[in-house]
Amino acid sequence: MVFKTFLSCVGEAFYLFVLGWLLAQLEIQVEGAYGWAEKLPTWRFSPPWFLKITNGKPLTGYHFYLISFLFFVFHFPLCFVPFSKAVEAKIIASYWLMGDTWDFQWFVWNPAWGIKRFLNEKIAWFPIKLIGFPIEYYLGLSFSFLTLWALDPKMLSRWVIVAACLLTLNALAAFASLIKPGKELGENGSPR
């Protein structure tokens, strides 16, 4: 029973990793070297009070609609099962875990960035780092954990396994990107 639960957690982590990786690949194609939709023709909501809440990031039309789409995709299971706090907690916690993976994989596989640049350079849209990683990653993990803690605490042990597996998969992907890196691109998108 314990091994079956562990395998289920590994499968869940793998699914969230693949979903995050695919979203990262899509965003690399859309944004190129310019994260946070910097060069995209999209609206931006950025009053000073909002920028204080978001660590200096405007809300872009691109991100608003993409995240709204993902919100509905993640809630699709509610078409088949009755709403419950436990199901909603799982949906929200899973979204936050996948979101950290999605963003990190954008840096890992983006030819204009890569893991070395991610760890060593300042990222304009992530001005605060803690132990080499944007503070938002820790917030995502915290929101994921706290959602389960508040709505379905019996799932916390499962969450720990899924989160640990996701961290491992992200580390393996970062290592793999160093073994077979893509061609690095400069700021203007041309090879360095």
Please provide the spans of the model-predicted regions.
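Aromatic-rich, lipid-facing transmembrane alpha helices and their immediate juxtamembrane interface loops
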Residues: M1-R192
